[in-house]
Each structure stands twice: as structure tokens, then as C-alpha cells.
């Protein structure tokens, strides 16, 4: 195998100082508190050149469970300027080929066995006002899930749809749902005719935004009820009459049980989106109660990226005896979206943050999402990066709803930027033009990996890249990804090109009380999340070197924390941790934040 060498670049490494006049606008309130401390900021070295898009070596295509990892050195990255020029030329060519057709090529007539004309939205037997909205939104041709779902749904049939994230499910269920309301001449006094259930608040907001666009030429009312928002205004709107309602499960059940003016006796259609995700996050009991409380004489649409036992159970109690099944991905050889270049990098624990810092610093002109495993890890990483002049946004499950909503839309509307988040952003959200998905902490399983990378390369002809961080001992995870039909390449980031700012990082954390506590909580949350990993044969918490793990959080030695992990790892971890005398214990004594039992919240 031929290795391509990159010419070494000689760069100086001046110290970095923070100018108050250029402070990033995305700095969090917590970061501002950090900046108010009397301690001086770390003199972080400027990184050396690092190519943002490495060339790759393909995993060998062999009929074995574990992909063959060759001993030869992976191909080193090409020059960034050449790649950017190639990207620009490719984008220009794609724009010319599009010919003002946003969806050309979504689905072929041959694939569906129908005429060329019938795959266009304009030929659907729906209201002209809906067609007008669809045209203004820029859609012309249907995706496979839309072409196979909309007509049966317009006929009033129940449907179980299975399609990967980013396949166009939202329009597939909204168009028939709106048609039901219009044909029934629904008025506010009739109450709610359509209920759409979403697993997360952000996805609910996004679905509601699309519904609002589709309904702008119709007289029917629409609304949204989600956890975290004020309940009283929701009650008032429901009592006035909301014909199409988007909701999260917990808040919907609350209103069904307690809001007297919430009329659902005329319900025509119940839509459950991302059903597998709804059940994964613990809403199984709520879903069964909701289904019992809504009228049985209704149309039901259930969409799920994966078919699990729990999804089957919900399908049995919610769908009629002969639902239509639509699965557009059943024969696909690759589980992830097309146009997605995926890779992994093998990086030891102590160099993880250095590589992340270097990568982000080099790609400030890109739009990047970085996934971490816990709220505390997101909080600390965002605070630290903002503190050292890498502006980032943070999104996780412990933020107040208004903060989450504002952050989400700020990133959606940004042309470039970095979002540090938990898996709260990993399902269904449509964030345009994301260049990179970085999985800094490992996903729990291949299914979660697929949902994470589904945030990029969304839409026809779109491109995106994904990078998975793995420790050397975690390479066995590749066999699970291969079995899940996920093609991966190995990326190499030469050690000489990674910014060596470890000393400065440790100085920042040790000299700043607020950052130290945040880092300590993140360190603890990382280990506890690792201990709860489902693939314990690969992600063995007892095999972690705490000394190396601590370095990635800015510690010279592991801090003293009470690690509440499972019984098999508890004693071992307490022994390892207590053998290390963290420097902060000497500095701050017992001034540690109170225990937080929600460090796993996502």
C-alpha cells in the first residue's frame, strides 16, 4: 500500500492571548464567570498546520466479522487548499446540474414502477393551497418514503414506515394529515384533529415549523405543546381549539389528563414519529396511556428508523389489523446516508482533547457538530473552548427550554460554527449544511452512530464527513459497525501536526476554581457513562487508564471523585482513583460542588 507523505510545515508556536474586544458572542454565562476570575488565562500555543480532510485507506472487504486493520501506515492528509478548491468546483458543477430543481433524482420512476409525472408533488391529489406551499418551500419531486407513503395515507390507511434519518418522513406524514383536516373542514370549535408525537423538544419544534409553512394558506389552526415550556398558555390555546397539534409524549399526556378544554373526541389522525427513539428515552408507559385516551376510530401513522420489540408492541396496539408497511431502506447495502464520507481515528486517551482542539482550530470556517456522552462533559468542553477563543455553542438536556431553542435556531441559521452537544440533537433534526460530525465520545451502539452521522449529508447531492474517535482498545467496535452496514475508513493525523498544549491546559484548569470543578464533574461523568455502555466487551470501564483519561480533562493526576459505577467496577475504580493525589485537593480542600445525580442526562 502506497503512503502519501505530506511535506512538513515549519510553523512557529506563539502564545495565544485573549483580546476582550474579540470575545466570541457564543460564550456562555458560565464562561463569562470564568473570565471574571483573577487568574490569568493560559498561554495556549498556536496549533501547527493540520489538514481537515484526510485521505483514507479503505477497510478490507472480507467476509469476516472484524474488519482487517493493516499494519501499514494510513494515507496522510492532502493539502487543505487543494481540497477546498475541489469542493468549490464540485459544488458549482452540482448547482449547474440541479437546473433549479431542488429534488431531482430523489427517486426514479423505474424504482417505483410509476410514470415520470406521478413522482412530482404537483401531481398529488391534494389541495392547491398545499401544493402552493410545497412549491414555495422548494420541493418538486418526492423522496422514496414520500412517494411510497403519501398515496396510501391519502386513502386513509394506517401505515408503518421504516426509513433512515433524513429521508423526508416529515412531509410524508404532514401532507396527508393536513389533507384530512382540510377535507373534513375542521374548525377550532372541533378541537384537535391531528396529533403528532415527537421524542424531543427540538424535533417537535422543527416539525411544527414545517407544518406551519404547509398550512399558511389554510384556515385550520396549529400549535405545539412541549416539556419545559409554560403550561398555562398551552392550556389556553388548546381550549380555543388547535386542529393540528405537535407534542412531546410527557406534556401531551399531562394535557390529556388535566386540561378540561382539550377536545380530542374528533381526532382523525395520530402520528408517532421516531417511535423507536420515543421508547428508548423511557416514554413507553406514557405512549400506552396516550393510545388508550385517544379515540380508537382514527388513522395512525407510525414511523421508526429501526424495528424493535418495543416498537412492535406499540404498533400492535396503535395500528389496525392491516396496516401498510413501507420500508425504503430494506435492500440498502449501506445504512448511512449517501454522500457521507466516514472515518475513524485511533487516539490514546491523553491526546484526545489535543486532537479535538487542533481539528476545531483548523476548521473554524466549517459547520461542525461534536457529540459527547454527558451533559457535564458538554458543559465543561464548551466552557473551556470558549475560554481559549474557540467560539462554540452547547446543547444538552439540562438546559432550560428557551436556552435550548435559542441555541438550536442560532446554529441552524449560522453559515459556520461549532455545536457541542449530547444525543439530544442526534435524532431527526434537520440542520442544514453541516460539514463535519465529530463523535468525540463513542456512541452506545451502531444505531446511535447512524443517527449521529445523519445530521450531515442531508438531502439529495449533499456531502458531509464524519469522524469517530476510538481508543486503541476500542477497535473492536468496528466489527459492530461493519455488521450494521456502515463503511468506515481510517484517518491519520500525524502526531507532529497536533498542537501540544497539554501544559497550558493543565495550568488553565489548576488555576481556575470554576473550570476545575467543571472539569472534575465532566471527568466523573465520562467514566460513569463509559461504565454504562451497552457493549461492555469493547468499552470496558475497568480497562481505562485513569491517569491518561484525566489528562484529556486538564488534570496532571486523576482528581478525587466518588465514582458511582456498577458493582463489577466500583472497587477497582475507587482503588485507582484514591491512589492518585489530585493537585486540586491540596489547593481547594473540600470546596467541591455537591453531588449531581443527573450527570448522564442527555
UniProtKB/Swiss-Prot annotation:
Question: Compositional bias (Acidic residues) spans?
Answer: 79-99
SUPFAM superfamilies per the UniProt record, alphabetical: P-loop containing nucleoside triphosphate hydrolases
Q: What class of enzyme is it?
A: hydrolase
Q: Where is this motif: DEAD box?
A: 273-276
User: Does the record's keyword annotation contain RNA-binding?
Assistant: yes
**Keywords annotated in UniProt:** ATP-binding, Chromosome, Helicase, Hydrolase, Nucleotide-binding, Nucleus, Ribosome biogenesis, RNA-binding, rRNA processing
Tell me a GO biological process for this protein: maturation of LSU-rRNA from tricistronic rRNA transcript (SSU-rRNA, 5.8S rRNA, LSU-rRNA)
Q: Where does the Helicase C-terminal domain start and stop, copy by copy?
A: 339-509
**Which residue intervals are annotated with compositional bias (Polar residues) in the record?**
50-63, 579-588
Which protein is depicted? Probable ATP-dependent RNA helicase ddx18
Amino acid at each position: 500500500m502506497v503512503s502519501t507523505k505530506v511535506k512538513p510545515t515549519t510553523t512557529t508556536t506563539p502564545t495565544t492571548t485573549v483580546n476582550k474586544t474579540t470575545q466570541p458572542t457564543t460564550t456562555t454565562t458560565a464562561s463569562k464567570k470564568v473570565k471574571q476570575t483573577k487568574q490569568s488565562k493560559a498561554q495556549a500555543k498556536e496549533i501547527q498546520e493540520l489538514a481537515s480532510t484526510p485521505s483514507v485507506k479503505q477497510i478490507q472487504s472480507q467476509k469476516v466479522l472484524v474488519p482487517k486493520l493493516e499494519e501499514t501506515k494510513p494515507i496522510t492528509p492532502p493539502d487543505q487548499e487543494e481540497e477546498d478548491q475541489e469542493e468549490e468546483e464540485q459544488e458549482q458543477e452540482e448547482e449547474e446540474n440541479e437546473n433549479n430543481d431542488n429534488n431531482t433524482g430523489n427517486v426514479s420512476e423505474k424504482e417505483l414502477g410509476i410514470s415520470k409525472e406521478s413522482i412530482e408533488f404537483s401531481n398529488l391529489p391534494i389541495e392547491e393551497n398545499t401544493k402552493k406551499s410545497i412549491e414555495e418551500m422548494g420541493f418538486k419531486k418526492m423522496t422514496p418514503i414520500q412517494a411510497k407513503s403519501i398515496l396510501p395515507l391519502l386513502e386513509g390507511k394506517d401505515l408503518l414506515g421504516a426509513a433512515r434519518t433524513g429521508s423526508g418522513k416529515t412531509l410524508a406524514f404532514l401532507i396527508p394529515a393536513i389533507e384530512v383536516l382540510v377535507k373534513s373542514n375542521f374548525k377550532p370549535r372541533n378541537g384537535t384533529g391531528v396529533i403528532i408525537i415527537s421524542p424531543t423538544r427540538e424535533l417537535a419544534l422543527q416539525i411544527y415549523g414545517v407544518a406551519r409553512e404547509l398550512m399558511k394558506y389554510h384556515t385550520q389552526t396549529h400549535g405545539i405543546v412541549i416539556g419545559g415550556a409554560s403550561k398555562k398558555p398551552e392550556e389556553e390555546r388548546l381550549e380555543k381549539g388547535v386542529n393540528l397539534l405537535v407534542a412531546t409524549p410527557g406534556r401531551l399526556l399531562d394535557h390529556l389528563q388535566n386540561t378540561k378544554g382539550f377536545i380530542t373526541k374528533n381526532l382523525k389522525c395520530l402520528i408517532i414519529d421516531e417511535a423507536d427513539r420515543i421508547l428508548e428515552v423511557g416514554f413507553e408507559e406514557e405512549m400506552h396511556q396516550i393510545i388508550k385516551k385517544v379515540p380508537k376510530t382514527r388513522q395512525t401513522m407510525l414511523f421508526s428508523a429501526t424495528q424493535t420489540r418495543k416498537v412492535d408492541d406499540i404498533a400492535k396496539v396503535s395500528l389496525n389489523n392491516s396496516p401498510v408497511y413501507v420500508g425504503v431502506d430494506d435492500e440498502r447495502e449501506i445504512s448511512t446516508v449517501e454522500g457521507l464520507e466516514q472515518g475513524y481515528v485511533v487516539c490514546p486517551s491523553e491526546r484526545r482533547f489535543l486532537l479535538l482542539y487542533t481539528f476545531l482550530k483548523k476548521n473554524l470556517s466549517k459547520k461542525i457538530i461534536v457529540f459527547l456522552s454527558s451533559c457535564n462533559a458538554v458543559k465543561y468542553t464548551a466552557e473551556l473552548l470558549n475560554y481559549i477563543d474557540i467560539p462554540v455553542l452547547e446543547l444538552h438536556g439540562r438546559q432550560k427550554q428557551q436556552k435550548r431553542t435559542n441555541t438550536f435556531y442560532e446554529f441552524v441559521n449560522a453559515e459556520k460554527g461549532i455545536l457541542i452537544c449530547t444525543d439530544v440533537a442526534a435524532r431527526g433534526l434537520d440542520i442544514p449544511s453541516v460539514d463535519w460530525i465529530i463523535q468525540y465520545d463513542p456512541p452506545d451502539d451502531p444505531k446511535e452512530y447512524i443517527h449521529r452521522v445523519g445530521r450531515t449529508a442531508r438531502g439529495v447531492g449533499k456531502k458531509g464527513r464524519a469522524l469517530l474517535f476510538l481508543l486503541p482498545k476500542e477497535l473492536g467496535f468496528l466489527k459492530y459497525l461493519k455488521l450494521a452496514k456502515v463503511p468506515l475508513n481510517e484517518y491519520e493525523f500525524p502526531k507532529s501536526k497536533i498542537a501540544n498544549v497539554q501544559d497550558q491546559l493543565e495550568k488553565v484548569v489548576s488555576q481556575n476554581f470554576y473550570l476545575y470543578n467543571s472539569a472534575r464533574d465532566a471527568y466523573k461523568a465520562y467514566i460513569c457513562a463509559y461504565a454504562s455502555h451497552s457493549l461492555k466487551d469493547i468499552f470496558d470501564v475497568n480497562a481505562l487508564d485513569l491517569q491518561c483519561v484525566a489528562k484529556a480533562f486538564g488534570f496532571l493526576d486523576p482528581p478525587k471523585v466518588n465514582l458511582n459505577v456498577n458493582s463489577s467496577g466500583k472497587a477497582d475504580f475507587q482503588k485507582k482513583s484514591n491512589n492518585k493525589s489530585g493537585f486540586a485537593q491540596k489547593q481547594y480542600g473540600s470546596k467541591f460542588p455537591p453531588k449531581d445525580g443527573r450527570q448522564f442526562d442527555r
